[in-house]
Regions:
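N-terminal cap/lid segment of alpha/beta-hydrolase-fold proteins
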Residues: 21-72
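Catalytic nucleophile-loop/oxyanion-hole region of alpha/beta-hydrolase
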Residues: 89-99, 110-149, 269-277
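Primarily recognizes the serine-hydrolase "nucleophile elbow" in alpha/beta-hydrolase
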Residues: 130-194, 198, 208-209, 213
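C-terminal catalytic histidine-bearing segment of alpha/beta-hydrolase fold enzymes
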Residues: 241-291
């Protein structure tokens, strides 16, 4: 009997060949739920959409995998963590739409619908670490990417999760791309709602320090690209600068691009003035680290 990951790799190969001009969703993989995962977030209510393309009360982790255009395959892949303040997921412009763009440019992209922490910070971290293990375990070659080139992308609170995978997880990505990420819990600098949702009644000075990820950077943190706007009033730009400085202090390759306007949460939206610029920046940076 074939292993599940082998079957998934076969599906990806077939989908990537058949849909080279479509880059549509190729495969859906249910990772686990609160009854089968190592930890539960305690959410017993059904998953819901409080508004279109916003998913709340997530209690089952799922990967939605979009295969790279085989004619452009770079050998790289990404796990994408949408934002939403750790209470919901902005699954379109920070998830599916972004994944399709990566796939069209030769990078297999897997959108992670991760479980909301609901005061259990270990829950989304174990989801993203398992997602990375799954992607790294797919058969090299057949899927258009290799295990050593699986990176992570995250936006806002999803950026905090991506940075957590890069600093706290045992299975780390090969690289990380962070869009206007939540990084620090420091007073006056933090997006407090994200940390309240992440830590719940466990929140303390000690947990704030631990989950302020500029404090967790080491020489083992992967190369990182940060993209943000100077006028972000939701997640202050200092979150990114703190992380960037910590990366450089630890000898980690890093690049940061700060756009003058755009605010917060632009993702791959077409109305973001610097959309084409960030897209070219990402492709150039990925090409550079692949050498």
């Amino acid at each position: 009997m074939r292993r599940p990951h082998t079957l998934l790799a076969t599906l990806l190969l077939a989908a990537g060949t058949a849909a080279a001009q479509d880059y549509g969703q190729a495969a859906t993989l249910k990772i686990w739920d609160n009854t089968t995962a190592p930890h539960s977030n305690g959410i017993a209510t059904p998953e819901r959409e409080p508004e279109p393309n916003r998913i709340a009360d997530v209690s089952q982790a799922v990967l939605y995998i979009f295969p790279a255009d085989p004619a452009k395959a770079t050998g790289q892949a990404v796990v994408i963590c949408p934002g939403g303040g750790y209470v919901k997921l902005c699954i379109d412009y920070e998830g599916y739409d972004m994944a399709k763009w990566f796939a069209a440019n030769g990078i297999t992209a897997a959108v992670l619908k991760y479980r909301m922490p609901n005061g259990h910070p270990e829950v989304p971290l174990e989801d993203v670490e398992q997602a990375l293990r799954i992607m790294m375990g797919l058969e090299a070659g057949a899927t258009g990417f290799t295990a050593g080139k699986v990176g992570i992308v995250g936006s806002s609170a999803g950026g905090h999760l991506a940075a957590s995978a890069s600093t706290l997880a045992r299975t780390k990505p090969a690289f990380s791309i962070l869009f206007y990420p939540v990084i620090t819990a420091e007073k006056g600098k933090a997006h407090q709602g994200s940390f309240n949702a992440l830590l719940g009644d466990k929140r303390s000075a000690e947990t704030d320090t631990w989950y302020s990820l500029q404090n967790r950077v080491s020489s083992e943190t992967p190369p990182t690209l940060l993209l943000l706007s100077d006028d972000d009033r939701v997640v202050p730009p200092v979150n990114s600068t703190l992380y960037y400085n910590a990366l450089k202090d630890n000898g980690v390759k890093a690049s940061m691009h700060i756009y003058p306007t755009g605010g917060h949460g632009w993702g791959i939206r077409k109305n973001f003035k610097y959309r084409e610029q960030w897209q070219q920046t990402v492709l150039d940076w990925l090409q550079g680290i692949a050498k």
